[in-house]
Curated annotation (Swiss-Prot):
Segments in the Lumenal topological domain: 40-56, 115-123, 188-191, 276-314
Reactions that this protein is recorded to catalyse: (R)-mevalonate + 2 NADP(+) + CoA = (3S)-3-hydroxy-3-methylglutaryl-CoA + 2 NADPH + 2 H(+)
Motif (INSIG-binding motif): 75-78
Underlying gene: Hmgcr
Post-translational events: Undergoes sterol-mediated ubiquitination and ER-associated degradation (ERAD). Accumulation of sterols in the endoplasmic reticulum (ER) membrane, triggers binding of the reductase to the ER membrane protein INSIG1 or INSIG2. The INSIG1 binding leads to the recruitment of the ubiquitin ligase, AMFR/gp78, RNF139 or RNF145, initiating ubiquitination of the reductase. The ubiquitinated reductase is then extracted from the ER membrane and delivered to cytosolic 26S proteosomes by a mechanism probably mediated by the ATPase Valosin-containing protein VCP/p97. N-glycosylated. Deglycosylated by NGLY1 on release from the endoplasmic reticulum (ER) in a sterol-mediated manner.
Keywords linked to the UniProt accession: Cholesterol biosynthesis, Cholesterol metabolism, Endoplasmic reticulum, Glycoprotein, Isopeptide bond, Lipid biosynthesis, Lipid metabolism, Membrane, NADP, Oxidoreductase, Peroxisome, Phosphoprotein, Steroid biosynthesis, Steroid metabolism, Sterol biosynthesis, Sterol metabolism, Transmembrane, Transmembrane helix, Ubl conjugation
Name of the protein this chain belongs to: 3-hydroxy-3-methylglutaryl-coenzyme A reductase
Pathway it works in: Metabolic intermediate biosynthesis; (R)-mevalonate biosynthesis; (R)-mevalonate from acetyl-CoA: step 3/3
NCBIfam families to which the protein is assigned, alphabetical: 2A060605, HMG_CoA_R_NADP
Enzyme class: oxidoreductase
Ranges per topology, Cytoplasmic: 1-9, 79-89, 150-159, 221-248, 340-887
Compartments reported by the entry: Endoplasmic reticulum membrane; Peroxisome membrane
Membrane topology: Multi-pass membrane protein
Positions annotated with a glycan in the UniProt record: N281
Amino acid sequence: MLSRLFRMHGLFVASHPWEVIVGTVTLTICMMSMNMFTGNNKICGWNYECPKFEEDVLSSDIIILTITRCIAILYIYFQFQNLRQLGSKYILGIAGLFTIFSSFVFSTVVIHFLDKELTGLNEALPFFLLLIDLSRASALAKFALSSNSQDEVRENIARGMAILGPTFTLDALVECLVIGVGTMSGVRQLEIMCCFGCMSVLANYFVFMTFFPACVSLVLELSRESREGRPIWQLSHFARVLEEEENKPNPVTQRVKMIMSLGLVLVHAHSRWIADPSPQNSTAEQSKVSLGLAEDVSKRIEPSVSLWQFYLSKMISMDIEQVITLSLALLLAVKYIFFEQAETESTLSLKNPITSPVVTPKKAQDNCCRREPLLVRRNQKLSSVEEDPGVNQDRKVEVIKPLVAEAETSGRATFVLGASAASPPLALGAQEPGIELPSEPRPNEECLQILESAEKGAKFLSDAEIIQLVNAKHIPAYKLETLMETHERGVSIRRQLLSAKLAEPSSLQYLPYRDYNYSLVMGACCENVIGYMPIPVGVAGPLCLDGKEYQVPMATTEGCLVASTNRGCRAISLGGGASSRVLADGMSRGPVVRLPRACDSAEVKSWLETPEGFAVVKEAFDSTSRFARLQKLHVTLAGRNLYIRLQSKTGDAMGMNMISKGTEKALLKLQEFFPELQILAVSGNYCTDKKPAAINWIEGRGKTVVCEAVIPAKVVREVLKTTTEAMVDVNINKNLVGSAMAGSIGGYNAHAANIVTAIYIACGQDAAQNVGSSNCITLMEASGPTNEDLYISCTMPSIEIGTVGGGTNLLPQQACLQMLGVQGACKDNPGENARQLARIVCGTVMAGELSLMAALAAGHLVRSHMVHNRSKINLQDLQGTCTKKAA
């Protein structure tokens, strides 16, 4: 029950960070302000003379107070030093934020408690620093930092609060009750110290439950790398935190704490209300007396300076004990910042390192369709291959063995030959100096201790030991990348696990996996990764479209496709270029809901088609994204099932995730008006996505684009090697009549899917969406003064495409998008990059249609494919597309 309440509290705080932060700061300032305006206007040393204060200061034990301050500073220093060993600047920053704001809240409470006299902070702050505990704060931060998205951040913070909240609450209660016993001792100084201690515990608890989780959520949201769509703070080293923190505290310890709490409550009740029902002085009054605030020992004086100057002079003036304390703090700060950097880096190299964020150059601000001059960084090199003269000489089949990682100083990325069958297995992490791995695997218990150790980690385990832990179910195979020190080693170990289960262990030898930036793949593109598939990428162009020239990348294994498209681009360019327009832009999602009766469904349909109903659904839908804007609803029913097709703009993203989120919110809003409505599925195939559907052909989906060009008769004869009359005749009887006879939906073209799929693979699109995106009707007719010129147009109503998210985050795909000048989001005009890419797709399809139809009209198709699409290589002697083996 308590865990559920704390979970709800954590989710609320993480979901509304601005409101919680502003509310907390406002409450803190109000506490100070109310005291400043309503408190005592007698300030010692400024307008009142307090002789007892001087006496108390002289009689106090300065040595003990100085030692206490120094111990407190050392304690905080060691806490931050331990946090630094985790290797995360975010952990350090968030913990520092927690400390600073906690001290601010505590100072406010002390000022309010002591009636705006700042002198009490000298004694209070050491107790605050000694009682502050960053372990809980860092544990909650680890929960958040192990997330892959902002939604997961909120969920993990809520989960962390559910686990840590009850324990921290009980600990704070016990600490307050234990320390509070000292307030009943009768010793004035001890009572004041214990009062400060209780206030410190309460201030820490207040900040941990409100301000801190809100700040964690906000900081991580603001630190997202928006261009890549991936968080730069995701820490692979903390991926196990959910499992580690899931273990509940010892129930025996919790029961003992509760019994102690009840006993201490009885002690406090007896001492305060039974044994001494009318205490003479409260702790606050005694503290004021101790600080010289009692009226009977003060006399009024005329202030010589303003109040702010008085406080400033008090802060600047320093006694010998303050000089010692400040000197120690400065020395430790200098040591921590400057002299521990090398030591920390050395220590972190022996741990699970944090995945480095992807470094990308800034984009130009003057043009939304921008190009980046440099894409690949030193540590993000794409795979390259080198010719090895020894490969063709030695053709024996080699079994995959663990790899030795290349030295970091190597400037070349190559596929490395695998170890021979007689070679001993070597771990990827075993190349670090000072790390010696045993030749035989150690016991699972010892390996688990090393893996979970903050000082060691997976780098101190061999591949054989990791495989042993996976086989024993101690490590899930799908988490190998997050648990290893590098993603690549996780992929390598998974390949070894898989090879042992295959009938042919050498099956993966030509599937590369080295030197690939897997940080962009994890959590976004693929799971259970065993490598990547190199596909040849050709270029067709220049394509002259709307007054600009484009070199179009095409990833394909079909011979003649790029050459044919390139010929079509040349014909279009010689004819003066093509023109294009985007007719519509809107992604769709079609959920299916059910009501008790068909008449009820009809009533909901009628309500949705009214302006009021549409406005309600649109408000809920639009609230889920700054880009998603509901455009229209298309509603139909089948019996008591209701199908609602929501169509919305999605910016530069393809938009399926965005519109699905908005659809879900809209359906929940619809349920508020019709409680009997049952949501069957957020996708009811009425969208329609990745399936042939007439609704996409008629209504459109994604981008609807039309492209046209006029090819002069001379170009038709000399470049396309045919005549306008022949091309028009073939187009009518093939693309129109032939497709109609076949009952085609949207297939009134020669081979639009060829070009669409090739561009989609090259540019990181969802290749399965070529089903709807390839809908195209190609029209040709004679034109010009003598009817010898060729007019051609392609209309594509459902190009589902985007330039951000998914595969567009991968570096090779980004390179292809940059070739076209449409990589990333367009800041000046959101959605323009995606629309421009759709135009390029349609223009390239038209070029492909032009060339293929010309080949068919001239009878050249079979001959060209026999020349360009039939390999003459003896496949029996083929070593593989990669000149070196992958493992």
